[in-house]
Amino acid sequence: MKKLVLSIVVIAISMLSMNAQNVNLKVGDKAPDWVFTDADGNEFTMNSWKGKVLQINYVDPDVSDLNDPANDAIKKETKAGGRIDSEKFKGFGIVDTKSTWKPNMLIRTIAGNKAKKFDTTILFDYKGTLQEKWGLPKDNYTMVILDKDRVCRGIYKGEIPESKF
């Protein structure tokens, strides 16, 4: 009987643990952390930019240009005289490599060009981690805005209309 009760408790805890990991991130939620690498193998977490508001572009490489107009507008606002304080803001990309047929070598080349264009960091999600941890859609372009405490302040899926920026 003790073994049966112990087994049930272990299974229940395991199920709760699995459900806690698979969350749909919503505005107002604290975002679960992650660890991703850049093209050189350097590891990054959200704490790599501690104290900054984060604009995270989670991108399927097949639609990597979809929100360039929005990113151009944000880049303009982070320059001198803009409305965004570049000392308190960091925009970067996470490539959803699991959602594409493109080879990783080509993806790294495309990402390198984007990193230069927007003077930013590009990280790689090879396993679809944010699809599982944050409930982000695959085969899409999603922009997530987190405040300095890593609370979600905005989620934009797909193309961002000009009226939003």
Which ranges hold each PLM region?
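Bacterial Sec-dependent N-terminal signal peptides
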Residues: 1-23
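N-terminal "domain-start" segment that seeds a small globular fold
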Residues: 21-44, 65-70
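Short active-site neighborhood of thiol/selenol oxidoreductases, capturing the structured segment around
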Residues: 44-70
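Loop/turn elements at helix/coil->beta-strand transitions in domains of secreted/extracellular proteins
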Residues: 51-54, 85-90, 118-120, 140-141, ...
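Solvent-exposed loop/turn segments at secondary-structure junctions
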Residues: 61-64, 96-101, 128-130, 159-160
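Structural microenvironment flanking redox-active thiols in thiol-disulfide oxidoreductases
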Residues: 64-114
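Short, internal strand/loop/helix patches
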Residues: 90-94, 105-139
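Thiol/disulfide oxidoreductase modules built on the thioredoxin-like
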Residues: 126-165
